[in-house]
Amino acid sequence: MKKLFTTTIMAASLSALTLTGCSSTTSTGAVGVDRQQLLLVSSEQVQQLSAQSYNKNIQEARARGLLDTNKAQLNRLKNISNRLIGQVGVYRPDAAKWQWEVHTIKSNDLNAFVMPGGKIMFYTGIIDRLNLSDDEIAAIMGHEMSHALREHSRERLSRQYATQTGIGVAASIFGLSQGQAELAH
């Protein structure tokens, strides 16, 4: 009876947490889209984790002599990003206050990303190997910025958190250890 009560309380708590965690991250603004997301982790937590990861990437690239090796290319990216950053308030007013940063890593990889909180990273390979114009760079950068503005990383972390919580509840119901429950997952 006690186990059933505990399980019921845990399931109710998980349900309440899930329902209260659904929210929108951006205004419909110019895009006219209002999408509900499961957001159980705070923006501040995600931005802090992103800043730590971004700084680690910068330190590693700097130590290997791969950070911002082409100043003209870096300035080009900063100019493009400044034009795009000027528009973020249309989609998400608080993003205009983010501490935006732009860096390049010398690598042949075709990659670029924008982390929560406005941490922009371009690998030189995507620019050089594809011989991108400013407009093409802006399209890639804008696309990556949209992931940060729409908080896709926060949503992904929240889903992982909900999954782990669900595994914990299931383990409790069936009397499994956390390891057994994760193995079953």
What is the role of each PLM region?
Residues 2-185:
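A Zn2+-metalloprotease active-site environment signal
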